[in-house]
Amino acid sequence: MEALGKLKQFDAYPKTLEDFRVKTCGGATVTIVSGLLMLLLFLSELQYYLTTEVHPELYVDKSRGDKLKININVLFPHMPCAYLSIDAMDVAGEQQLDVEHNLFKKRLDKDGFPVSSEAERHELGKVEVKVFDPDSLDPDRCESCYGAEMEDIKCCNSCEDVREAYRRRGWAFKNPDTIEQCRREGFSQKMQEQKNEGCQVYGFLEVNKVAGNFHFAPGKSFQQSHVHVHDLQSFGLDNINMTHYIRHLSFGEDYPGIVNPLDHTNVTAPQASMMFQYFVKVVPTVYMKVDGEVLRTNQFSVTRHEKVANGLMGDQGLPGVFVLYELSPMMVKLTEKHRSFTHFLTGVCAIIGGMFTVAGLIDSLIYHSARAIQKKIDLGKTT
């Protein structure tokens, strides 16, 4: 018993008799308020614990032979779909001209609304649907190229064949109405119908995972002496307005928390025949979810440059929107992990202990202040 008596001396929490305890309205108010605050802080801590945290790691990218998926949704309010070409090429030498096999073009009116609910989809290398029945023509015919014949081009049986022959010669294709093939296919009518329209380009590209570029530019694209050029001879440079709105642009799949810096970018061309260049640095990214799902995607940063393209070729540039991308040799690995349960318990204990301590100090201050004031009032009454 004597040992127990000595042990009691170490009690840091001495108890008072129930008869000596005083309950006040101020103490009740402090208890209720502190209890509510404690509950709110606990719920906040619980919500934080239930979320996952992401741990970033940096590695050398050792992947080889992969494809790079580029998601695109861009609006050109003053560039008709019939005038616009989309091309992609990489430093490996692979060039995909007029790439549309995974892209759609949707015609827009002058107010930005779709002309029709259906979008145009053109397969790469696929002949477009004509306004006449091609079966009505002799399949063995050999029509004129109107003076643009070459050794490898003897016959021009379509408007596109004539345009190609003219481009090979370097001639301007200015008056398609004088060419029977174009008049038969309604080429001028198609161009005139879309003259004051805009165009929405959306879909995705799949390119080699090496540095390269893709661009949106007016005129038909083609190769001339191993150089990529666009036929702008039938366009007036003063009529080319490359104002654009990038609704979405990303490289790969989205993951939680991703930021695509070009999303919702609206750029107004200050004058005609502008060349916009976006220099993009792509960082390969692997995102691992807590359930084991692995997303292989990319992040990117970007800078923009713009200038007036006064020429059709050469150093003066080409009117259009160009996205030039490079791939980083480093890869970012983002791993989702559950938060530590011990940290959660520590936080809850800190909340409870801290609130009890602060509430006790406030209650003591209120109680002793009220007693001091009451004593002064009582002394005033006796005198």
UniProtKB/Swiss-Prot annotation:
Required for MARCHF2-mediated degradation: annotated span: 1-25
Glycosylation sites: 266
Pfam families in alphabetical order: COPIIcoated_ERV (PF07970), ERGIC_N (PF13850)
Side of membrane Cytoplasmic, spans: 1-25, 363-383
Side Lumenal, residues: 47-341
Keywords: Acetylation, Endoplasmic reticulum, ER-Golgi transport, Glycoprotein, Golgi apparatus, Membrane, Phosphoprotein, Transmembrane, Transmembrane helix, Transport
Keyword Magnesium annotated: no
Residues modified as Phosphoserine: 116
Source organism, top-level taxon: Eukaryota
Positions carrying N-acetylmethionine: 1
InterPro entries recorded: Erv, Erv_C, Erv_N
Site location (Ubiquitinated): 8
Chain ranges passing through the membrane: 26-46, 342-362
Cellular component annotations (GO), alphabetically ordered: COPII-coated ER to Golgi transport vesicle; endoplasmic reticulum; endoplasmic reticulum membrane; endoplasmic reticulum-Golgi intermediate compartment membrane; Golgi membrane
Predominant place of localization: endoplasmic reticulum
Gene Ontology biological-process annotations: endoplasmic reticulum to Golgi vesicle-mediated transport; positive regulation of intracellular protein transport; retrograde vesicle-mediated transport, Golgi to endoplasmic reticulum
Bilayer topology annotation: Multi-pass membrane protein
Compartmental location: Endoplasmic reticulum-Golgi intermediate compartment membrane; Golgi apparatus, cis-Golgi network membrane; Endoplasmic reticulum membrane
Subunit composition and interactions: Forms homodimers. May form a heteromeric complex composed of ERGIC1, ERGIC2 and ERGIC3. Within the complex, the interaction with ERGIC1 is direct. Interacts with ERGIC1/ERGIC32. Interacts with ERGIC2, the interaction is required for the stable expression of both proteins. Interacts with MARCHF2. Interacts with SERPINA1/alpha1-antitrypsin and HP/haptoglobin.
Task performed by this protein: Possible role in transport between endoplasmic reticulum and Golgi. Positively regulates trafficking of the secretory proteins alpha1-antitrypsin/SERPINA1 and HP/haptoglobin.
Family classification: Belongs to the ERGIC family.
Name this polypeptide is given: Endoplasmic reticulum-Golgi intermediate compartment protein 3
Species for this entry: Bos taurus
